[in-house]
């Protein structure tokens, strides 16, 4: 049975999370090491191999992509093959966001993580749509959404666009479901003093969410160096970069599907896709996040905090701190899982979300 914590309970160690506490300062050693950039033996081994081949720059870039979330976004496709699109943003610089909509009932807005797309929800969205109107959106720069050559790819920029989407579609009694970077977008939307959003958002589901300032590994810092970032993308095939990223994001690498690698590698073959990845990564932990996180306690709506027990990207301690901070929150642990519960453990994730929504 998955472990449940509710806000206000005693500070206990969750079963199955040996050595873990709910303090960011005393989390499991392997998770803390991951947050600081020591990704057990997988990353260093790959980097050593690439260095021998003169491809260290690519290794750094590839692993940097994994750290943002999990996977890389589904590639560009002819727009006539997909739809619909929401035209958002200012009139002089509109952005078209692709979204998939299915089902009826109270709405759920699914917000993917850094580098992912609507594809990440493929295992759970159809079942959720049995009882809800499910809207899965591709954030700006990912999936089949526009990828303009600008720098507006922060969590704040993405939240601006989704706030407009919520209003334009007149969504009410809305549950936001956000994974990793997308969870940060969901938190920001819940905090906004935007009168247009007042009373619209009723619940939050946060999956392995970026929520607090954390140490950024050297791989991300290298993306700030134009020559290094461009060199990394050009020297090794996108499929190799994607495979490295997924092996860091998954706990059980045997669950990585070859089709998944091909799908997630596609955007790295386009200039626009590379631009979006680089500029999103540079803002993955935005300025002002510390001040923003001090306001989390003002979020009163029911919130499910769902975390993987082997997350090497956003440590378990982050989820436990969120549980203590959000006054109306429930914490659930997904066992034998890395950073992608909706992909690596979809059935367990689906059941936890359904139980929360039905409660």
What are these regions (language model features)?
Residues 172-215:
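Conserved hydrolase catalytic core segment
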Residues 101-144:
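Conserved HGGG/HGGXW glycine-rich cap/lid loop of the alpha/beta-hydrolase fold
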